[in-house]
């Protein structure tokens, strides 16, 4: 589905990755309402509809590990395509979205 810059991960894998690496950048590409209802701690809200217009603000994360998620894994691939097109090289995709997240969320 994705190129070699992108790795699909389960919620368990994602949890381990972000727990062990405080430099991980987490992008929640859902709506503000969805984000406010509960998100992964430390996640930055970047709705998929505005990601393209915010790409310059995200440029500082280009060389970092970036975890991208939405609700169920349907919108995040659109966001990931935009990131890949803008030379992000180390992207992790929460393949089933936050709906599969079995850990605490922040409100």
Write out the residue ranges for each language-model feature.
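Rhodanese-like catalytic fold shared by cysteine-dependent sulfurtransferases
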Residues: 1-24, 32-65, 71-107
């Amino acid at each position: 589905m994705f190129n070699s810059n992108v790795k699909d991960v389960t919620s368990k894998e994602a949890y381990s990755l972000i727990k062990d690496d405080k430099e991980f950048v987490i992008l929640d590409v859902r709506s503000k309402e969805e984000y406010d209802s509960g998100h992964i701690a430390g996640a930055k809200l970047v709705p998929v509809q505005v990601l393209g217009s915010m790409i310059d603000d995200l440029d500082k994360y280009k060389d970092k590990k970036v975890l991208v998620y939405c609700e169920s894994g349907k919108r995040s691939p659109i966001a990931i395509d935009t990131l890949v097109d803008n030379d992000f090289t180390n992207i992790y995709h929460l393949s089933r979205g936050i709906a599969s997240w079995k850990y605490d969320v922040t409100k």
